[in-house]
Amino acid sequence: MCGLNAIYAYHPSAPPVDRGELLRVRDRMRARGPDGEGAWYSPDGRVGLGHRRLAIIDISERGAQPMVSADGKLAISFNGEIYNYRQLRADLERQGRTFNTDSDTEVLLHLYATKGMAMLADLRGMFAFALWDGERRRLLLARDPFGIKPLYYADDGRSFRVASQVKALLCGPVDTSPEPAGEVGFLLWGSVPEPWTMVRGIRALSAGHWLAVDASGAAAPVAWCDIGGVLSAAANAPSTLARGEAIHCVAAAIQDSVRAHLVADVPVGAFLSAGIDSAMIADIIAAPGLRPYTLTLGFAEYAGTANDEAPLAEELARRLDAWHSTLIVRRQDFEDEREKLLAAMDQPSIDGVNTWFVARAAARMGMKAVLSGLGGDELFASYPSFHQVPRLVRYGRRLRHPKPLGRWLRRVAALLSPPLPPKAAGLLEYSESIGSAYLLRRCLYAPWELPALLGEDFARAGLERLATPSALARTIAGNDHARLQVSALEMTWYMRNQLLRDSDWASMAQSLEIRLPLVDIDLLRRCAPVFAAHPDIRKAELAASAAPRISPQILHRPKTGFSIPVREWLRPPASGPGRGLRDWARFIHQRQWNAA
């Protein structure tokens, strides 16, 4: 886990790489890699790669980056982990390839030399990289299928710039004028949807895409793995396993993914809550003779309530004989940390506060890598959206023209005193399709509220550039399976743009790597056909098979989610925002968000 950056002066009129700029951008990401720093420049000075290192695999100096191939033709700056790198290395060695390190980075260089970008299909892990192919004179970028690791770029028509963070790129000469799609997207969703950012000059490389830049400039990004497509394929080819066999199949896949995510040359701990997902992970890593390091986050406001996860988590930790710690966070902690948190936030978001505090605690305990249960709700259909969204569409289909009728009713509802809550007012209008129902379920501010916040013209421009309805429809194209449709939407929109991004910036600000066994492409491909055939399989059934030491109290505990007492924290006399997530979002936005 690291921070990377690159500059490619591809146009003949562009000046050579400004080495000072490359190092400034690199060192803006110091927290992502406190263990080392490096830079590489092509002999002609037209290409530069930078790297900040958090040493997890092959922690020796041999694993330092940027890394150059033995023949000098390839150079790479890589952020992430390749969990199957040992198997890939063994295959390459059988082909006669020789290695100078024990790192997964060197495996990427050899894989590219043998297969080109087709190598991406072989990778199991979380990754973003910039690779210079000196022979073909092209810079290649790529991201993992889910978008666990971020990658941003800026292209001014002469030079192409890359970095792991938006704020790092802004240390260089990029267009910082406001991007309507970014601002509208933030208030619409509570996070900025890919590929947009808050500034016009910077874009995200979308998850599951790669991009090539040569002397003629940047080509269009190429989709090499589409999560919506994986789920669509499963919907059209469901498993033939009987229900009992299917449960055991998924349980085995979960165990395999958790164990794969333990590959490291440093200890790997785990976040532990009273939820099934993290409990499963902790149970699986607590093998005989091994005591896992576990950490629970609690909140003073939740003590003694149904949202207090600490007692059940501590009970499971004792059962697993784990080295366990519980951190209790109070409102004053939030007040004390708020400005640091906002400074670290790479793009505006209403989330990430919980990860900030638990990651800070893990780092202070000396951990470098931890496992998290993030992604389980999207995979195992645990959110209310999995029944609410299809139900709304079923109701809408009973009417002949729900959208125009709903739009009329919404306008009438606005005249009531008091007016209906926005989502209630939009129920009929947004019941036309799974995509529109999902938007209503997940939106922070409804689309018709945005002009009052941003101005009519700016809001309209942002909505047009986002083209959200068509983008949502593409996510579930070819998929008519209700459970897998909602999984595709949750994974591609909420999880990718909010949970994964917030998990990255909030943990990397503490120099901590978070690994996600339930956000794994191999696991998804094994599980999705099973859920297509047996959509009624419950998470508790899977956990009982995969992790038998979990108590019935955890297995059957009502879902609360990894939540924070945001209403209590944002209620006066706390300075700054008002109460609730919408006020928190407006507070962030009204600070005239400065990505620098």
Please annotate each region the language model reported:
Residues 1-346, 355, 547-558, 581-596:
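Cysteine-centered catalytic environments shared across enzyme families
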Residues 145, 157, 357-420, 503-523:
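Active-site adenylate/phosphate-handling loop in enzymes that bind or generate adenylated species
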Residues 250, 350-354, 487, 491, ...:
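Soluble or luminal CAZymes and related metallo-dependent hydrolases
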Residues 272, 373, 495:
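Conserved S/T- and glycine-rich ATP-binding loop of Class I adenylate-forming
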Residues 339-343, 385-388, 569-571:
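Short low-complexity, flexible loop/linker segments enriched in glycine and/or proline
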Residues 347-351, 536:
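Donor nucleotide-sugar recognition loop
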